Amino acid sequence: MQTWSSVAVPRVPGTSRPLRLYDTATGQIRPTAPGRVAKMYVCGITPYDATHLGHAATYLAFDLVHRLWLDAGHEVHYVQNVTDIDDPLLERAERDSEDWVVLGLRETALFREDMEALRVLPPRDFVGAVESIPEVVEMIEKLLASGAAYRVDDPEYPDVYFDRSFTGRFGYESNYDDETMRAIFPERGGDPDRPGKRDPLDALLWRVERPGEPAWDSSLGRGRPGWHIECSAIALKHLGIGFDVQGGGSDLVFPHHEFSAAHAEAMTGEHPFARHYVHAGMIGLDGEKMSKSKGNLVFVSRLRADDVDPSAIRLALFAGHYRDDREWTDELLKQANSRLARWREAVSLPSGPDAEATVDRLRDHLADDLDTPKALAAVDAWVDEALRHRSGTVGSESAPALVRAAVDSLLGVVL
């Protein structure tokens, strides 16, 4: 798939900081410590509707990871998938009497436009599930050969499932107990009541063709892949086992990321799938999680159509910590617009307070598990001082330009 256009990222004087992130698997904030090439996989959209602010918050969080690694001098290999074949996409297409391929292409194109408008640095590899079916099939064949996968005893639909007990490590990523897993599994695409499964929590790898559903020829028979195996196959192909960060929303902790890791580890015999499992909180509206199923959505494209500045959207979402569930409100956007106006006024002055310490604090806070509230407060403090002394010469003539470059480079906000 074609990715979106990138933007120039200014070089900022001073010393970068090693990035530390909260790892869901260990429950600790730990250094990411990548090599020369930092490797990140972030789960992408299922393209049956437009990009909402819950999506935006997730991709903006990992955009900060990307930017901080660049600031530290790393080359970044970022991979993102598109789940362009899945039940929700097929269900929406049927509801609207639309071809599922056309629907997926249109919404993927809109997603690219939204990401470009928000100045999210693009992935090097933007990969659809459909184009990855050969890799998925090869992986499932290996899992079957090793005993990690099995076919259900169903003469009509002998689907292939993953045996979750195979690795002996299942559950390490989410740290959920069986009771919690069993409660969540059916809510997030699982089929615990499928006859013939060894365990209700075993995950689908290959769905044999059903009447009226899209299917592909393969050595497994005509069918289509399960959700979790798609990300396993794409990540292994482009990044290999043991990459630095597996990212996504907190609703992907289980079953998606747990099974993606288990599939890859079962096939390779190596552990871990990723060195950090990092999850962004949910964005709510009117007291409920913003989601397509609930229909309580604020779309990025609608905000853009209403001439909302993308930098204000970034600042509004950065006002809360990325791991926290938080509310989107009109007041939040109003405050972000006010903050953006003040910042722009301050950096337009001919001089300002010395800014090196401000840039240091900005780096410190962002490197500490992406603490954007403190990072924004550090810039606010410099802006307040600059505006207090706007009528006279204060500090340095180069300070406004330094703050502008740092805010652009590290926060992706244009001043």
Curated annotation (Swiss-Prot):
Pfam families: tRNA-synt_1e. It catalyses: 1D-myo-inositol 2-amino-2-deoxy-alpha-D-glucopyranoside + L-cysteine + ATP = 1D-myo-inositol 2-(L-cysteinylamino)-2-deoxy-alpha-D-glucopyranoside + AMP + diphosphate + H(+). The keyword Flavoprotein does not apply. Zn(2+) binds at residues 43, 231, 256. Its EC number is 6.3.1.13. The keyword Nucleus does not apply. Its cofactor is Zn(2+). L-cysteinyl-5'-AMP binds at residues 43-46, 58, 81-83, 227, 249-251, 283. Keywords: ATP-binding, Ligase, Metal-binding, Nucleotide-binding, Zinc. It is an enzyme of class 6 (ligase). GO terms for biological process: cysteinyl-tRNA aminoacylation; mycothiol biosynthetic process. One of its GO terms (cellular component) is cytosol. Catalyzes the ATP-dependent condensation of GlcN-Ins and L-cysteine to form L-Cys-GlcN-Ins. Belongs to the class-I aminoacyl-tRNA synthetase family. MshC subfamily. This is L-cysteine:1D-myo-inositol 2-amino-2-deoxy-alpha-D-glucopyranoside ligase. The gene is mshC.
